[in-house]
Design a protein with these regions (language model features):
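Extracytoplasmic/periplasmic, Sec-exported soluble proteins
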Residues: 94, 119, 148-152, 168-179
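Basic/polar, cationic surfaces and motifs that engage anionic cell-wall
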Residues: 2-13, 18-26, 35-36, 44-78, ...
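Short coil-to-beta-strand
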Residues: 151-162
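N-terminal catalytic cores of peptidoglycan-degrading enzymes
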Residues: 2-149
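A cross-domain feature marking catalytic cores of carbohydrate-active enzymes
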Residues: 104, 162, 204
Length: 245
């Protein structure tokens, strides 16, 4: 987990976090909208009306439409995190997404859900995966979760918590590995993230963090192979994002 923190995550000496300048979506100069019409540059319009209807939300500062309880991953159940534990954003148009960060909860599935709903915790991840393979989504992927202890990595990453403790290898179950791998493959497909260890990382690998999860017992070779297999499998017919009542 990140703090910004964690429940009781193992820690290491801290360093200085890096910062990254946000990337805009469509340039303000490239997309001119006024009174519902497209501004003309010389004799040619910059964009046709039908393009504007599709792209208006990509103008920096304009958000995509949202629905309560909307999911980015069809295999998850929605449980909302406290708004104090994340920041509203419009990714990937304001911040490109190019990392998946693997965390371990240092506690139970229920305790992780509880602390992410606590505004005093000041940290959360987008997803939690249980030892039985269940997945809960608590923050939309387009929003910034306070997960990594590093602003740049918060803005560029999707975070996944895994139920258990870093010093208990038995907590890293077959069902959890398989479920998490399917989730990570789905995230990578949505955002064009390469499936490699440069882009799928542990919390311990975030610059400046004081955490050590997912710990020495996390089997990276096994996990990456499962992610690759999941990515190569036929896609689910269920569209994403989806919404559950």
């Amino acid at each position: 987990m990140g703090n910004n923190g964690s429940t009781r995550a193992a820690r290491k000496p801290s360093g200085k976090p890096s910062r990254k300048k946000p990337a805009d979506g469509v340039s303000r100069r490239a997309l001119l909208i006024g009174g519902g019409a497209v501004a003309a540059a010389g004799t040619a319009a910059l964009l046709a009306r039908d393009q504007v209807k599709r792209l208006w939300w990509q103008v920096p500062g304009v958000e995509k439409p949202r629905k309560p309880g909307e999911l980015d991953y069809a295999g998850a159940t929605w449980v909302a995190a406290s708004e104090a534990n994340w920041r509203r954003a419009d990714r990937p148009d304001d911040f490109p997404i190019d990392r998946v960060i693997i965390h371990v909860t240092q506690g139970s599935f229920a305790s992780a859900v509880k602390v992410f709903q606590d505004p005093a915790h000041q940290a959360a991840t987008h997803y939690i995966v249980g030892q039985d393979g269940r997945v809960v989504q608590m923050i939309r992927e387009l929003d910034v979760a306070y997960q990594a202890g590093n602003r740049s990595f918060n803005e560029r990453a999707v975070g996944i918590e895994h139920e258990g403790f870093v010093d208990r290898p038995k907590d890293l179950t077959k069902a959890m590995y398989a479920s998490s791998a399917r989730l990570t493959a789905s995230i990578c497909a949505r955002h064009g993230i390469p499936i490699d260890r440069e882009h799928i990382i542990g919390h311990v690998e975030v610059p400046g963090t004081d955490h050590t999860d997912p710990g020495p017992h996390w089997d990276w070779d096994r996990y990456m192979e499962l992610v690759r297999r999941a990515a190569a499998a036929p896609p689910s017919p269920t569209p994403s994002p989806s919404a559950k009542a």
